[in-house]
């Protein structure tokens, strides 16, 4: 490792530091200690999550553990929920300029996802002191809570 950056903070820097291709990286989950699958490594990288260092070894997080950790974080550290105008008033920063993650999968929200939350009059959630929302992938589906259709023949 280089002296100026002894512990790479993300998957891409870790690969560069050790001369590895992303698909060749083998890393364990910080929670369950199992090896991350190729899909888990890619998802961890795309979500721009930080590598955790323990006793000189890097760890990531598998998808299953990330979802469980997110749910636990919601239960333990949820402060309150409010609409976008309240978030902007509280922070003094327009929603599109705020860094936010999905409170379900941890993916950084893009401006289209933030805009969809604003236009849809959906709430943002303050969890562990950070403003969060849900990404398009984790958004409730429009028919998810609809009553089942009965068909007659």
UniProtKB/Swiss-Prot annotation:
A zinc finger (unnamed) spans 29-65, 102-138. The gene is E6. It is found in: Host cytoplasm; Host nucleus. Its main location: host cell. Forms homodimers. Interacts with ubiquitin-protein ligase UBE3A/E6-AP; this interaction stimulates UBE3A ubiquitin activity. Interacts with host TP53 and EP300; this interaction inhibits TP53 activity. One of its GO terms (molecular function) is DNA binding. One of its GO terms (cellular component) is host cell nucleus. Gene3D superfamilies: E6 early regulatory protein. Keywords: Activator, DNA-binding, Early protein, Host cytoplasm, Host nucleus, Host-virus interaction, Inhibition of host innate immune response by virus, Metal-binding, Modulation of host cell apoptosis by virus, Transcription, Transcription regulation, Viral immunoevasion, Zinc, Zinc-finger. HAMAP family: HPV_E6 (MF_04006). The keyword Transmembrane does not apply. This is Protein E6. Coiled coil: none annotated. Belongs to the low risk human alphapapillomavirus family. The cancer-causing human papillomavirus E6 protein has a unique carboxy terminal PDZ domain containing substrate but low risk E6s do not possess this domain. InterPro entries: E6 (IPR001334), E6_sf (IPR038575). Plays a major role in the induction and maintenance of cellular transformation. E6 associates with host UBE3A/E6-AP ubiquitin-protein ligase and modulates its activity. Sequesters tumor suppressor TP53 in the host cytoplasm and modulates its activity by interacting with host EP300 that results in the reduction of TP53 acetylation and activation. In turn, apoptosis induced by DNA damage is inhibited. E6 also protects host keratinocytes from apoptosis by mediating the degradation of host BAK1. May also inhibit host immune response. GO terms for biological process: DNA-templated transcription; regulation of DNA-templated transcription; symbiont-mediated perturbation of host apoptosis; symbiont-mediated perturbation of host ubiquitin-like protein modification; symbiont-mediated suppression of host innate immune response; symbiont-mediated suppression of host type I interferon-mediated signaling pathway. Belongs to the papillomaviridae E6 protein family.
């Amino acid at each position: 490792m280089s002296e100026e950056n002894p512990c790479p903070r993300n998957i891409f820097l870790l690969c560069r530091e050790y001369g590895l291709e992303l698909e060749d990286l083998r890393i364990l989950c910080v929670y369950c200690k199992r090896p991350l699958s190729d899909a888990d490594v890619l998802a961890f990288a795309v979500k721009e999550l930080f590598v955790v260092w323990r006793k000189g070894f890097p760890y990531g997080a598998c998808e299953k553990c990330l979802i469980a950790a997110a749910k636990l974080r919601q239960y333990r550290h949820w402060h309150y929920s409010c609409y976008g105008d309240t978030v902007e008033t509280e922070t003094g920063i327009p929603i599109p300029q705020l860094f936010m993650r999905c409170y379900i999968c941890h993916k950084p929200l893009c401006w289209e996802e933030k805009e969809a939350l604003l236009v849809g009059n959906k709430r943002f959630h303050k969890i562990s002191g950070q403003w969060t929302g849900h990404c398009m992938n984790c958004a409730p589906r429009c028919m998810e809570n609809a009553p089942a259709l009965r068909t007659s023949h």
